[in-house]
Amino acid sequence: MKSILRSTTRNLITSSRRFENLKTTEEIRNFLAESTWSINELLKSPTGSSQPEVSPEIVKKMLKLSGLNDLKDDQSVTKALNLQMMFINHLYDNDHETVTPSPKRNENNGIFRLLASDHLPQRPLELNDLLKQINELKPDPSKGEVDFTISDLQRDSFVINKRKE
């Protein structure tokens, strides 16, 4: 009874398909050359979801920001980016059959951004700002920085006398 249960469990766990025994190198090559699944099966765009679409305008803006020239085939780049976005969203979904976007995906959209223009630019650091920061700098004992003056060093000084022989 144990052996039947074990073999049944093993068959269910290891694979839902049964393969014939592959004995030669040629049979293995032929088997691996056949496509048994496609990533498009996993990456079906859910209908009615609020998934952001990558538009050709976004592709042109990203190319401009990266310093690359405009591509002749923007359609393929747009399609590739849309597939990548679907794949990333698929990674954040626990249930593969969901139609509505998951809360994890929504949290992710708030953290990761594609375009630099979505971020607030910082004010450039100038020399006067650096000098002001240096003047306001104080030693921090938690970092092991100790405040001392030159008189503290002179007080604990020592002298080495050499004898001539």
Swiss-Prot record:
Membrane topology field: Peripheral membrane protein
Classification via Pfam families: GatF
Key words of the record: ATP-binding, Ligase, Membrane, Mitochondrion, Mitochondrion inner membrane, Nucleotide-binding, Protein biosynthesis, Transit peptide
Keyword Ligase belongs to the record: yes
GO MF terms, alphabetically ordered: ATP binding; glutaminyl-tRNA synthase (glutamine-hydrolyzing) activity
Localisation: Mitochondrion inner membrane
Transit peptide: 1-19
Catalytic activity: L-glutamyl-tRNA(Gln) + L-glutamine + ATP + H2O = L-glutaminyl-tRNA(Gln) + L-glutamate + ADP + phosphate + H(+)
Subunit and interaction comment: Subunit of the heterotrimeric GatFAB amidotransferase (AdT) complex, composed of A, B and F subunits.
Function: Allows the formation of correctly charged Gln-tRNA(Gln) through the transamidation of misacylated Glu-tRNA(Gln) in the mitochondria. The reaction takes place in the presence of glutamine and ATP through an activated gamma-phospho-Glu-tRNA(Gln). Required for proper protein synthesis within the mitochondrion.
Annotated protein name in UniProt: Glutamyl-tRNA(Gln) amidotransferase subunit F, mitochondrial
Gene that specifies this protein: GTF1
